[in-house]
Amino acid sequence: MSEKYDAIVIGMGPSGIFFAYELIQLKKAKNILLIDQGKRVENRNCPIEKVGKCVKCQPYCNITSGFSGAGAFSDGKLSLYNDEDDDIYVGGILQEYIGVENTKRLIDYTDDIYLKFGADKKLEGVNFKDEVKVIKEKSKKQGINLINIPIRHLGT
């Protein structure tokens, strides 16, 4: 195979997919080879419904291996942040490295990409603010810190 690539990305989970996307957006690569173990999405199926148990597909599980892993067949949640709160409760300790505003910008940027590719515009966790406030106060009395942030539902 004499094909030449500007970049080769191994592993097509969210990090690999976003890395390839960014290479293209930044015009750093046009011809990218994406490699992941497992079959193509359209060739992946799980026999568990037919046989009633996991048959341990070989060499790789048809559900967890391949482009997007199990995410190709399930839903996900993109945790955002609360505009009314100075703290960000997602992204680990990223804000300690790049600051709160830059972290918020990255979260917004990621959310915009998902929306661009068809994510549901509706946000979960933004309704019932008064009820959440009451539950949060009750939780605090029990030593529990209830964190309420918007969630974007992705997939099925």
Each language-model region and where it sits:
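Beta1/beta-strand and adjacent pyrophosphate-binding region of the FAD-binding site
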Residues: S2-S15, L33-I35
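Short coil/turn connectors at secondary-structure junctions
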Residues: K4-Y5, K28-K30, F67-S68
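Gly/Ala-rich phosphate-binding loop of Rossmann-like dinucleotide-binding domains
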Residues: A20, I24-Q25
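Short beta-strand "acidic-cap" motif of Rossmann-like dinucleotide-binding folds
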Residues: A29-D36, V41
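Conserved N-terminal/central alpha/beta ligand/cofactor-binding core
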Residues: R40-T156
